[in-house]
């Protein structure tokens, strides 16, 4: 957010707009759950650093951390991937990643690119189960057409909430 637009889609949409819109939908759904307290690291067009995001979660001793994204590859690349991926770093996050991912795939209707381990800052430096969701590819015409639709974002939000609730046993 803020000065960092994130990835830029084929039609010149900013990743930050997809992510904020989707995250606000997730927040609205989670706030209906009496056992869940939601804290966002970004609720407007601001730019908290990765370090600040991890610090917020760690300082609050959050139970879970979810980072929402849309993937992209550089223009002119030989491949043009499409689909949804879920990333985690530490083994303690694997079950959470699998649980959310199983809801995300049917919700998006995009290719299943799997649950993958990667040392990403926010999933590595947070002290609770943490995942990063790549909900589609900005660099794919098919994915981009979905990413900016309200219906798609709502389905993603509902899938993430279903995964969180199942993981927490709610």
Locations of regions flagged by a protein language model:
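Short, electropositive alpha-helical surface patch
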Residues: 48-64, 121-132
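Active-site-adjacent mobile loop/cap segments within catalytic or ligand-binding domains
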Residues: 67, 74-75, 85-87, 114-170
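Solvent-exposed loop/turn segments at secondary-structure junctions
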Residues: 1-4, 43-48, 70-76, 91-94, ...
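Solvent-exposed, polar/charged alpha-helical surfaces in well-ordered, non-transmembrane soluble domains
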Residues: 16-32, 55, 59, 94, ...
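Alpha-helix initiation/capping motif
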Residues: 12-15, 19, 46, 89-93, ...
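Active-site histidine-acidic residue metal-binding/catalytic motifs
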Residues: 1-54, 60-62, 74-75, 81-82
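A short, gly/pro- and small-residue-rich
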Residues: 79-95
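Sec/Tat-exported extracytoplasmic proteins
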Residues: 26-30, 34, 42, 61, ...
């Amino acid at each position: 957010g803020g000065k960092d637009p994130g990835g830029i889609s084929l039609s010149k949409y900013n990743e930050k707009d997809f992510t904020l819109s989707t995250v606000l939908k997730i927040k609205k759904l989670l706030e209906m759950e009496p056992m869940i307290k939601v804290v966002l690291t970004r609720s407007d067009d601001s730019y908290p650093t990765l370090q600040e995001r991890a610090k917020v979660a760690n300082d609050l001793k959050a139970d879970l951390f979810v980072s929402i994204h849309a993937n992209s590859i550089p223009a002119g690349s030989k491949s043009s991937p499409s689909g949804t991926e879920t990333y985690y770093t530490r083994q303690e996050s694997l079950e959470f990643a699998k649980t959310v991912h199983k809801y995300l795939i049917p919700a998006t209707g995009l290719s299943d690119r799997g649950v993958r381990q990667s040392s990403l800052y926010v999933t590595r430096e947070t002290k609770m189960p943490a995942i990063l969701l790549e909900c589609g590819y900005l660099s794919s015409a098919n994915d981009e057409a979905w990413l900016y639709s309200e219906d798609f974002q709502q389905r993603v939000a509902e899938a993430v909430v279903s995964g969180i609730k199942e993981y927490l046993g709610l």
